[in-house]
Regions:
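Membrane-anchoring/interfacial helices and their immediately flanking loops
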Residues: 1-38
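Ser/Thr-rich, low-complexity intrinsically disordered terminal regions
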Residues: 3, 28-53, 57-60, 64-80, ...
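Interfacial segments of alpha-helical transmembrane regions
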Residues: 11-18, 75-90
Length: 220
């Protein structure tokens, strides 16, 4: 015997759920494609995630809103399901919009606590600039403290000597890479962080420099 035909309300709820999942699923696919070097960062992040997935998430809100109206006309249970889907769709859309706005902020990509004599980082384009409110710890940090600070800020230590610690950090999502160096001198410890990309990053480079300085001060 043939199964019962789906009601308009049920079909609307299903459509809303599919639409709500489309944006996040595309973003996940974009991350995987960038990680596999199948597409460029510009294609995966700027196009697929911050434009197409964002547009899909906004469209999902519209679909979920229409679905809620149809579902409530069918039954209370389907209406509640559609309402829950709408709430999720609004949350996802808001998250995409927030991320797009943050990533559009053009923060500095080469920052240091010593503008007169920044710690050296190979192939850094420069010039280094200061981050607002971030200043060098006016003390000579121990090598162990500097290494701990690197790890606390999410950097993998790539080189260490008596007066210098180097590290590299690769973002977990789209692989945005930063290099950092902590230079130890009598009476002062300086930090430099350089982004290995040329794009707006919402101030991520300054945030990492702040994390390093805060960790150095906490480890004194």
């Amino acid at each position: 015997m043939a199964g019962r035909r789906a009601t308009p309300g049920l079909m609307a709820v299903r459509a809303a759920m599919v639409a709500t999942l489309a944006g996040p699923l595309l973003a996940i696919v974009a991350v995987l494609l960038v990680g596999a070097d199948a597409v460029s960062l510009e294609t995966g992040l700027d196009l697929l995630t911050l434009k197409v997935a964002l547009a899909l998430s906004v469209l999902a809100v519209v679909v979920a809103l229409v679905a809620m109206v149809i579902a409530f006309r069918t039954s209370l249970r389907l209406g509640v399901m559609a309402l829950a889907t709408l709430v999720v769709a609004v949350g996802i859309s808001g998250a995409f919009l927030w991320r797009a706005q943050v990533m559009a902020i053009a923060g500095p990509l080469d920052v240091t606590t010593d503008l007169a004599d920044p710690p050296a980082i190979a192939n850094a384009a420069g010039p280094s600039v200061a981050c607002p409110g971030v200043s060098a710890p006016m003390t000579q940090s121990a090598q162990g403290t500097a290494g701990w600070a690197m790890q606390q800020a999410g950097f993998r230590i790539t080189g260490a000597s008596l007066f210098q610690i180097r590290g590299e950090r690769t973002g977990a999502v789209f692989g945005l890479t930063h290099e950092a160096v902590i230079r130890i001198r009598p009476g002062q410890t300086d930090v430099r962080v350089v982004a290995r990309y040329d794009r707006a990053d919402g101030g991520e480079t300054c945030r990492l420099a702040t994390k390093l300085v805060d960790a150095l001060q906490a480890g004194r």
